[in-house]
Regions:
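Beta-propeller domains
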Residues: 104-113
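Intrinsic disorder/low-complexity segments
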Residues: 1-51
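Blade/loop signatures of beta-propeller domains
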Residues: 49-79
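Extracytoplasmic beta-rich repeat domains
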Residues: 52, 62, 80-95, 105, ...
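Residues marking helix boundaries in flexible regions
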Residues: 23, 34, 216, 233-235
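Short loop/turn segments that connect beta-strands within beta-propeller blades
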Residues: 112-116, 153-156, 193-197, 233-237, ...
């Protein structure tokens, strides 16, 4: 069955791009006007959990909350696997009935969410590491370890454009209107046009930009390898404020209700007040002193992330420990949350389902190889890749 005819009714609306802009790529035309937002002193950040039918970028949404509204079955079973030719560290994107994922072989692959059949493969020319695809208006964007940012036709896998951005890219693209925000190891955060890849502006930091930017109120937020958390205005690339994290950060910030949450390599999780522009609290496990590489998932009651201490940590929004769950190896996968359950991979080769309330294990699946990629959730299904090149779908 072809890509057009396999789209579910639920995903048809989200995928109406497949019947438009095939011959002329012009994402999100705004009549030449780029809408900017006023930075309010009260700084409201209204979390918008990911719609049930889509997981269109890393962490699901602009705020990087890692939370889906999808109704996932209480009892999971493996539905299909796809064998890539190399490791999968990239986290998948799901739009309607289509899955997009990058591989270390340098391929961006589009698959059928229902059965895992391949629609197309795009050759990036360089390995794809942790950069995860982002979909917008008929195009899929992804970075590679050669420093290239690619725009690919979501229907047929043909290249719209590609552009070199200084150095290797492990950050994931985030599409905001007709602009793409993405970090590079050349120490810059880039703002690039979706139409042709031209650089609109770039912001210089003092270290590699590994973090994927979170977006709220017209600002891009990055937690940096230079130990600084920054708010950058998307309209012109100017820094609005910064906060010292006190340590190197490899994780991306999750934004919710005026706060940003992320872990550091100084073994801490930080809660940063965006209104006060200061660290509101710091969490550190009392015994196990290991870095946090996993990006947090955030709900109205919990901050959940993995640690290199082999634990999944569940915190209250005030930074107090609510629970921990022990795995057998580092947890570098970033958790996803749906329906009161936490979904996360571990380098012990297992995919875990935990209670959001108390961290109790509800289910596990042994993949037999490290799972450092993060789950994507949409249409009642969960997709995650492994270090041995297998892409799993559960439902």
């Amino acid at each position: 069955m072809g890509l057009l005819t396999s789209v579910s009714r639920k995903g048809a609306k989200a995928l109406r791009f497949f019947s438009k802009r095939i011959s002329s790529f012009a994402p999100l035309r705004l009549g030449g006007i780029f809408l900017t937002f006023v930075f309010l002193l009260t700084f409201p950040v209204h979390a918008q959990d990911t719609p049930a039918e889509n997981w269109a970028q890393f962490r699901g949404n602009h705020q990087l909350t890692g939370v889906s509204l999808s109704n996932v079955p209480a009892t999971l079973k493996p539905l299909w696997t796809y064998q890539a030719d190399d490791a999968i560290e990239s986290s998948a994107a799901i739009v309607g009935s289509t899955v997009f994922v990058g591989t270390a072989k340098g391929e961006l692959v589009a698959l059928n969410l229902d059965n895992g059949s391949v629609y197309w493969k795009y050759d990036a020319g360089n390995p794809i590491g942790e950069s995860s695809p982002a979909y917008s208006d008929g195009a899929v964007f992804i970075g590679d370890l050669g420093g290239m940012l690619h725009a690919v036709n979501a229907r047929d896998g043909k290249r719209f454009w590609s552009v070199k951005l200084g150095s290797e890219i492990k950050s994931s693209p985030v599409v905001y209107g007709d602009r793409i925000l993405i970090g590079s190891y050349d120490e810059h955060l880039y703002c690039v046009s979706t139409r042709n890849g031209s650089v609109i502006w770039k912001f210089k930091t003092n270290g590699p930009v590994h973090s994927t930017p979170g977006i709220a109120s017209g600002l891009a937020f990055i937690a940096g390898c230079d130990e600084v958390f920054r708010a950058i205005r998307i309209s012109d690339g100017k820094e609005v404020f910064n906060v010292s994290s006190g340590a190197y950060t490899g994780a991306s910030p999750a934004l919710r209700a005026g706060m940003a949450y992320y872990g550091t390599f100084d073994n801490e999780v930080l809660g940063v007040s965006l209104e006060k522009k200061e660290v509101a609290w710091r969490y550190e496990h009392p015994q196990r002193k290991f870095p946090f590489y996993s990006s947090a998932a955030v709900t109205a009651s919990r901050v959940v992330l993995g640690g290199r201490d082999k634990l999944v940590h569940g915190l209250s929004l005030n930074g107090k420990a609510a629970w921990t769950f022990a795995t057998r190896a580092r947890v570098e996968s970033s958790p996803a949350i749906a329906g009161g359950r936490v979904y996360v991979g571990s380098n012990d080769g297992r995919f875990y389902v935990l209670s959001l309330t108390n961290g109790a294990k509800l289910w596990e699946f042994n993949a037999g190889a490290p799972l450092s990629a993060s789950p994507a959730i949409a249409n009642g299904k969960i997709v995650i890749g492994s270090q041995d090149g297998r892409l799993y779908c559960f439902g």
